[in-house]
Amino acid sequence: MYRFTLPRDLYHGKDALSSLKTLEGKKAIVVVGGGSMKRNGFLDKAVDYLKEAGMEVKLFEGVEPDPSVDTVMKGAAVMREFEPDWIVAMGGGSPIDAAKAMWAFYEYPEITFEDLITPFSFPKLRQKAKFCAIPSTSGTATEVTAFSVITDYDKGIKYPLADFNITPDVAIVDPSLAETMPKKLTAHTGMDAMTHAIEAYVSTLNCDYTDALALHAIKMIHNDLKKSYDGDMDARDAMHNAQCLAGMAFSNALLGIVHSMAHKTGAAFSGGHIIHGCANAMYLPKVIKYNSKDATAAERYAQIAKFIDLKGETTEELVDALIAELRSMNDQLDIPQAIKNYGPGGVKADVSIIDEKEFMDKLPETAKNAIADACTGSNPRQPSQEEMEKLLKACYYCLLYTSPSPRDISGSR
């Protein structure tokens, strides 16, 4: 038996933000990030709409990128004092993810973060509040998913929290909020969405419902991401819908080891963060090569290649064409092909911010953590410790995974 869960209501299109006026309640807390929603006037609009709905409104501002356990606990404490019956999270994936976790600790102050790490272990929510999510970036799709990614900085590990309980009640997908994204953010979030759709399509939990969403999202992203990156606002609007479709797919089919590796490398090194969407873009071609040793996965990758009009006479040729196309997209979007060329903020660089020796020293533990990640279970192949270490090396040095040893593909950076 499968389950397919979505928000009860999804408002989309220009001026969808005004649907906040339809929410019914007494108090709403609005959770936001670093200030872009305020600078661009969207936060004031949201507050005005909520007040028009008759609600008292409180703000929780300043959620950092890759939100921490500490931020989650602070937000939950504010919620317990204010006692909202609506939690409205707006911005990129970080404030929405943080607000999802705050929601659990608001309703159940006695639980611990460790209680929530096990997938699908959340207590029943909506005892005190409902949840509305409003994305301003076109990538994470957390507005329609059962996921929240929170970082434990003491351990240097990102944890994907997973439970259908944290699927928002209302999603507002207004493309106006995404039109101010800078180019680099457009690239990284777009390839994050592409990874969501591809991993959902080859997941061991895929089904007819998720397949349709994933394939259409892949085609839209393939057609529109570069145009959006170059400033085409119609393509930017299309990408906002495409990432949401990808989110509906992966929230129900789940993900794979591209995300496992991105979660466990993102905050693991002293040189700085590996931005999540950029990590996915770098790792995806290597993981496709690894997963394609499974015949079923290879056939599904080949189906993706055909769907976006790539050429190949055999399944293997189609898989290789898909890998080449994704690497080409990375080049067009100025995304590094490997960690060895990962510069500050995800720019291409001759010298990586991730020290090679530190990476190699931490390789066994990083591989172990990636294998244990919640996303690994639905990957088409279950990697051994040795295989995961080889994959991570491939991601550092720009190699394609082969057996018994990776093959150098470092011709383009």
Go through the PLM ranges and name each one.
Residues F359-L400:
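Short, amphipathic C-terminal "tail helix"
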Residues A268-G271, G277-K357:
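Gly/Pro-rich interdomain helix-loop hinge
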